[in-house]
């Protein structure tokens, strides 16, 4: 509810943002296994597109760059644990969608804190609904098909 006041039409998404009680229920659902998997549709609409009036602004927000740090922050806050993160982002997704298990790995620094800033976003839209928040737990490297990529 507070996010609508802060973000305006940038917060327009489907399904819409919910109450704090709904958010708490989602965390509980991850913890107790009710929620099988989680993802982001990553709708990187530009600020020009999102500046349109409600109903004309496209729905959706960018999320791929902050999904893992948001989940790792929830781990640091004891809302969920690391096993929950692996289960909802990898293990269950592979099983549900019959994806091949691969040897790709994401290395994370669970203690790294970083302020989310619009100017640091790599996607075309150049903004994040989480700008201004400090998140704890960030990827440092990805190993994909035997190639190592350093995260910035």
Regions found by a protein language model. Name each.
Residues 1-5, 49-52, 118-120:
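Short acidic, glycine/serine/threonine-rich loops at helix termini
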Residues 1-38:
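Histidine/acidic residue-rich metal-binding segments in metalloenzymes
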Residues 2, 21-31, 72-79, 138-148:
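Low-complexity, flexible helical/coil segments
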Residues 10-11, 29-39, 43-107:
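His/Asp/Glu-enriched, well-ordered alpha-helical/loop segment
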Residues 11-21, 58-62, 129-134:
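A short acidic, glycine-rich active-site loop
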Residues 18, 95, 113:
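Glycine-/small-residue-rich active-site loops that bind phosphorylated ligands and cofactors
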Residues 53-56, 103-152:
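C-terminal cap of metal-dependent C-N hydrolases
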């Amino acid at each position: 509810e507070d996010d609508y006041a802060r973000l305006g039409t940038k917060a327009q998404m489907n399904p819409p943002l919910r109450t704090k009680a709904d958010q708490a229920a989602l965390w509980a659902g991850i913890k107790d296994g009710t929620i099988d998997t989680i993802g982001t549709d990553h709708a990187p609409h530009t600020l020009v597109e999102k500046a349109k009036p409600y109903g004309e602004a496209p729905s959706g927000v960018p999320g791929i760059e902050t999904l893992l740090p948001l989940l790792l922050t929830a781990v640091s806050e004891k809302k969920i644990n690391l096993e929950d993160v692996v289960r909802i982002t990898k293990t269950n997704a592979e099983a549900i969608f019959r994806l091949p298990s691969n040897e790709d790995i994401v290395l994370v620094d669970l203690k790294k804190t970083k302020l989310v800033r619009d100017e640091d976003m790599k996607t075309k839209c150049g903004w994040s609904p989480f700008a201004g928040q400090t998140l704890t737990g960030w990827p440092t490297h990805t190993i994909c098909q035997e190639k190592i990529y350093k995260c910035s």
